[in-house]
Swiss-Prot record:
HAMAP family: NrdI (MF_00128). It comes from the Bacteria. This is Protein NrdI. It holds the Pfam family Flavodoxin_NdrI. SUPFAM superfamilies: Flavoproteins. Belongs to the NrdI family. InterPro entries: Flavoprotein-like_sf, RNR_Ib_NrdI_bac, RNR_NrdI. GO terms for biological process: protein modification process.
Length: 136
């Protein structure tokens, strides 16, 4: 199975979700000076920011990470977290990334997710990678 790459702000909601998920994952650093480059296909797990619009929905460190053509080329899907208080903007970062990068938006969960979200993502990620061609 390929990896997960995620971003978590200082609130650590996404970090806690990843810890509960128990799958291999690499964190996009908060520090602008730190960069990572992936070397295998991955699914991105990202929180949504902003108060409802498209602008600002994707965290800046995630934009920097995806602006690296190598990292962007290995992206295979996106999972978004959000806050349902933002209505239609819930999980907006997933929609923005899926559209701009041409990958499927696989799932969304609220804040740090429920046990059901953990189980759904764990199962969904496993099944997603099983359906992918070996050289994808």
């Amino acid at each position: 199975m390929s990896q997960l790459v995620y971003f978590s702000s200082s609130s650590e909601n996404t970090q806690r979700f990843i810890e509960r998920l128990g799958l291999p994952a690499v964190r996009i650093p908060l520090n602008e000076r730190e960069r990572i480059q992936v070397d295998e296909p991955y699914i991105l797990i990202v929180p949504s920011y902003g108060g409802g619009g498209t602008a600002g929905a994707v965290p800046r460190p995630v934009i920097r990470f995806l602006n690296d053509e190598h990292n962007r080329a290995l992206l295979r899907g996106v999972i978004a977290s959000g806050n349902r208080n933002f209505g239609e903007a819930y999980g907006r970062a997933g929609d923005v990334i899926a559209q701009k990068c041409g990958v499927p938006w696989l799932y969304s969960f609220e804040l740090m997710g429920t046990q059901s979200d953990i189980e759904n993502v764990r199962k969904g990620v496993t099944e997603f990678w099983q359906r992918q061609p070996q050289n994808a």
